[in-house]
Swiss-Prot record:
It is an enzyme of class 6 (ligase). This is Phosphoribosylamine--glycine ligase. Its cofactor is Mg(2+); Mn(2+). Signal peptide: none annotated. InterPro entries: ATP-grasp, ATP_grasp_subdomain_1, PreATP-grasp_dom_sf, PRibGlycinamid_synth_ATP-grasp, PRibGlycinamide_synth, PRibGlycinamide_synth_C-dom, PRibGlycinamide_synth_C_sf, PRibGlycinamide_synth_CS. The gene is purD. Its EC number is 6.3.4.13. It comes from the Bacteria. The keyword Ligase applies. It catalyses: 5-phospho-beta-D-ribosylamine + glycine + ATP = N(1)-(5-phospho-beta-D-ribosyl)glycinamide + ADP + phosphate + H(+). GO terms for molecular function: ATP binding; metal ion binding; phosphoribosylamine-glycine ligase activity.
Amino acid sequence: MKAVRVHILGSGGREHAIGWAFAKQGYEVHFYPGNAGTKRDGTNHPYEGEKTLKAIPEEDIVIPGSEEFLVEGVSNWRSNVFGPVKEVARLEGSKVYAKRFMKKYGIRTARFEVAETPEELREKIKKFSPPYVIKADGLARGKGVLILDSKEETIEKGSKLIIGELIKGVKGPVVIDEFLAGNELSAMAVVNGRNFVILPFVRDYKRLMDGDRGPNTGGMGSWGPVEIPSDTIKKIEELFDKTLWGVEKEGYAYRGFLYLGLMLHDGDPYILEYNVRLGDPETEVIVTLNPEGFVNAVLEGYRGGKMEPVEPRGFAVDVVLAARGYPDAPEKGKEITLPEEGLIFFAGVAEKDGKLVTNGGRVLHCMGTGETKEEARRKAYELAEKVHFEGKTYRRDIAL
């Protein structure tokens, strides 16, 4: 085992994938709280906030998987956390802060207004034409964006969002964004200060059903690497550079992962949103493409060393198996049977009486790899078909 231990905060497929990559390179891995699958690659522990962080040795590295930990301030509690401090995590934690940050530092984003009351919303919506885009200020677990054609419906739902009657636990100001047509793209990087290395580009599928139909989800699958023209990559690098320059001007140094949610509009990438952590299910594909390269990039980013590009080896496809009722009311407690072979990252899985059972919306990530996208896709779907639980739901068009 390597001298440095790795402590991963979270319980989803993304966290399992990160831990798997480190375990594969010989690191001792600990998960907080983890799930029924993560303990195959490390040790699970309860997560008790600051108390948990204080007990982790200073020489070890802590990697928060999801944004809640960073917004909570885990990087403020300890210096061995690979993630930005909570003041910088506001880039994800507050859409209003993020949009004002982009405007302040001349970073390309959609034209916007902020409305703090229903009356302001009614007045400011007049500056926009349909479709109307309304975004909740705070974290809303992927449910905080409304895209509507009717001005009256936008005012009605946007007002409910402001006063806390639309989404449970979400209230406060909203961002009105100009609608941008184009192709969405995610760009993720490992960052230390002004230095960064962009990870392989991955396409994910947000809608529940084939053909991009049905409700939005956390993501039903992904594949990579996606080929991006070099001139577009150069423009994306400029967006990362300007963002990190802005963070520095605000008096902070960025260390951790940075994710740009982009829209390619008229040949230029615009930032729709920032995330201060890796995407899920994109992470599962990135680490599978080159686990060793991913681990090295993270460790060099953590230490402030020279980060090398993570070169993809072949192709990888992730097919997500979800529970019936996802995303609104996923069924839990259904027994799972798994094949003996194949790479599967666990998400909403628990152990009950020695058996694996469903315990969340997205249950498992079935991975396929190959020299071609078609080979990787075939393997991922062959694996998905060998997994059994009542109500298994998945898309058939990932990586087509």
